Every structure is written in structure tokens, then in C-alpha cells.
């Protein structure tokens, strides 16, 4: 198989409208799952939030899953209610949590991000991605 044949063979077909509706439903479900994780973290105290605690691990998953949504092309049209700066902050926090380790994480900023900023972002994204029947 040459390169031209390979390109044709692996070119994705255009998505149908039904698939886009399913994408929206999947996005809303994932945003709600992230919100549940945020609530789990918020139910703990700041004093008990540290590297190695369950809440810290759940908070890391909040950031990792939220950042992953912005990398999915099928969700792009539903994720416009967030600023460029917010996207960069989420990606940076995810990179610290996932790649450089928690030693370089500022726990106070991480706590504030997950318990204050992320809920505000989730509210906007859920509102934006909700279908007319859900508003």
C-alpha cells in the first residue's frame, strides 16, 4: 500500500447529525461526572487535601479529564464558553499533575482551582452544551 492509498483508506467519513447529537450527550455526561468528582473534593477540608490523599487524587482526575475534553475534536463546537486563559491554566495544571509530579504543584492554588474555578467553568460548559430540551 502506497502513501496515497493509505491516506484514502484511513480518511474518516463526515460525521452524521445523529453522531453529533450523541457527542453532545457524551459531553454532558462527562461534564456531570467531572462535577461529581469536584463535589467529592469539596466535601473534604483544605487541611486534609495533600499529595497522597484520596481527595488530591480525585482532584487530579478532575483536571486530567477536563483537559482531555478540549483535545477531542468532536466536542470543539460545544466548548466555547471558556476563555483561552482558562484552557491554558487547565492544560498547565494537567501537565503538572500528569507529568512533572506533585512536588511542583502549589496545593493552595490546586485546591482553589478544583473547588472554585472548575465548578464555575463546568456550569458554563454544561449550560452551553445542554440541548434546547434541557434548558
Give the label of every model feature segment:
Residues 1-135:
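Solvent-exposed interaction patches of small proteins and small membrane subunits
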